[in-house]
């Protein structure tokens, strides 16, 4: 049983504390009895402005900060990301990465995690936006801004039955992200954040590039920043883009044996060139691109086998409410 316990958390969000913030000293006193046990402790942070005061108190810090149609500690109308136009129904999705990096650096060497925004039937209408959960693209980019910082666990808020039935179009995208995480997990767990760079085009955000490197290889991420708020639908819109991404490589990866793109369908060929401690990847990206660099041959084959194994496991349930109407109807009938 013990290896299956992720962490002990009983304080919720101490920065809010049900209306009364719990002081850091009091948080430490409540967590201290666990110091002599094998159970790691966890705290859900919620406000970047003061989470430095809680740094180092728990074994597994994480946070929640949803970027569309949800309560938030930051004032969305103050962001001037899009030519000075402000919106009240969402915030720049890349602020997820900003906050993950902040939490990571404040709490080193502790591993960090993130509550990623998923379907939820309890959020209200914000700023006139009718859709009260993220779109599939909004879900994917929020998750990958977090993953690219080398979080070691991602939690979805929330996967209640009512929420999944209310937003059926999110079941498939979440399943794909989950499968990709399982493909990447060893690289994330054994590696560390290596490089982060934001690229601008004509002075505007263009790409967030990040890498995680470790003994068996590197993960490279290219997150698209040219999405725009649609004034009618009040959702963020994306389009596929061509890009050439330059990533620095540590010495042991300077002559990679394998470079490939990765997604839920497994490894794919990608155009690249390597030299002078860098790799340049040319690809067409929709929302987020994931790439793998390996110092020796064999990782691609292992990932292909792992993808097939994960797919067989998913299919073994013979239940696919995302793709089959009959299965979705069975899911819907479970509602009270």
Positions of predicted regions on the chain:
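Histidine-centered catalytic/metal-binding microenvironments
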Residues: 318-336
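Intrinsic-disorder-associated interaction segments
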Residues: 89, 167-170, 174-177, 296, ...
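C-terminal beta-strand-rich structural cap/linker in extracellular carbohydrate-active enzymes
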Residues: 275-318
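Glycan-processing catalytic domains of CAZymes
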Residues: 1-257, 265-293
């Amino acid at each position: 049983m013990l290896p299956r316990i992720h962490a002990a958390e009983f304080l919720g969000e101490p920065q809010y504390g049900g209306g009364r913030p719990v002081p850091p000293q009091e948080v430490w006193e409540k967590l201290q009895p666990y110091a002599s046990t094998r159970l790691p402790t966890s705290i859900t942070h919620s406000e970047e402005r003061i989470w430095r005061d809680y740094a180092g108190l728990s074994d597994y810090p994480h946070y929640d900060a949803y970027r569309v149609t949800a309560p938030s500690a930051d004032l969305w109308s103050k962001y001037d990301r899009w030519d000075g136009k402000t919106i009240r129904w969402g915030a720049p999705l890349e602020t997820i990465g900003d906050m993950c990096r902040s939490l990571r650096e404040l709490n080193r060497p502790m591993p960090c995690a993130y509550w990623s925004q998923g379907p939820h039937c309890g959020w209200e209408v914000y700023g006139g936006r009718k859709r009260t959960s993220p779109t599939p693209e909004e879900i994917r980019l929020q998750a990958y801004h977090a993953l690219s910082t080398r979080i070691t666990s991602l939690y979805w808020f929330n996967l209640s039955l009512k929420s999944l039935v209310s937003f059926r179009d999110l079941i498939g995208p979440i399943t794909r992200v989950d499968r990709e995480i399982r493909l990447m997990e060893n690289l994330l767990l054994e590696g560390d954040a290596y490089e982060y760079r934001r690229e601008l085009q004509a002075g505007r955000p263009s790409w967030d590039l990040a890498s995680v490197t470790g003994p068996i290889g590197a993960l490279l991420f290219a997150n698209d920043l040219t999405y725009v708020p649609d004034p009618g639908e009040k959702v963020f819109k994306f389009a596929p883009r061509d890009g050439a991404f330059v990533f620095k490589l540590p010495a042991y990866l300077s002559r990679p044996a394998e470079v490939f793109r990765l997604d839920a369908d497994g490894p794919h060929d990608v155009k690249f060139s390597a030299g002078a401690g860098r790799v340049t990847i040319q690809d067409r990206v929709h929302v987020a691109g994931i790439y793998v660099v390996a110092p020796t041959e064999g990782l691609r084959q292992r990932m292909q086998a792992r993808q097939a194994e994960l797919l067989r496991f998913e299919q073994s349930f013979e239940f696919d409410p995302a793709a089959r109407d009959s299965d979705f109807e069975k899911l819907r009938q479970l509602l009270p």
